[in-house]
């Protein structure tokens, strides 16, 4: 019988104040790639992240407060990776860009970004 990979569940619910966002930024760096992240309100930031790694493929469900996340030259230099991230927008709105391409993602939309080039995501409200 083959064993199902463990589901990693992370939540900011047990953290208070700005520590919530710092904790979340660390989890995102460990789960995906290092990103430069910010949010309009660090004190009330909330997140639930569920991640399962199956071989080389990671599947992650993220529900979170508004935020901005960028893969910058500095974060790329710190941890060079040549991965693809497939974003499937389930709720909320996302503005994303990479190179000369930009898109506004609504529920049901998707995008593919590479981690070896700069990219930017902005979620202006709660999203999934």
Model-derived regions, located:
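N-terminal functional module of multi-domain proteins
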Residues: 2-127
